[in-house]
């Protein structure tokens, strides 16, 4: 019986925090911008993109460019 109360308590804590929008549930399935860049064939650079490449997005939270 105590374990069911504990599970219910944990569930309430998770669901009560959902109004802020920053729970761990919103991060499920979310990939970092660096991962998406490299998986798409690009590379993350802090400097300008090399010749014959274009900026396709950002990396590291907008601090670098994804060049492809």
Swiss-Prot record:
Subcellular location: Secreted; Membrane
Disulfide bonds: 37-66, 44-59, 49-67
One term under GO cellular component: microvesicle
GO function terms (MF aspect): CCR6 chemokine receptor binding; identical protein binding
Signal peptide: 1-21
One example of a Gene Ontology biological process annotation: calcium-mediated signaling
Propeptide residues per the UniProt entry: 22-32
Name of a matching Pfam family: Defensin_beta
Coiled-coil segments: none
Family listed: Belongs to the beta-defensin family.
Subunit (UniProt): Monomer. Homodimer.
The protein's name: Beta-defensin 1
Organism: Saguinus oedipus (Cotton-top tamarin)
């Amino acid at each position: 019986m105590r374990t069911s109360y504990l599970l219910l308590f944990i569930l309430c804590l998770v669901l009560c925090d959902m109004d802020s929008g920053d729970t761990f549930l919103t991060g499920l399935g979310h990939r970092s911008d660096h991962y998406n860049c490299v998986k798409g064939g690009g590379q993350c650079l802090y400097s300008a993109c090399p010749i014959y490449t274009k900026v396709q997005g950002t990396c590291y939270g907008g601090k670098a460019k994804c060049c492809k």
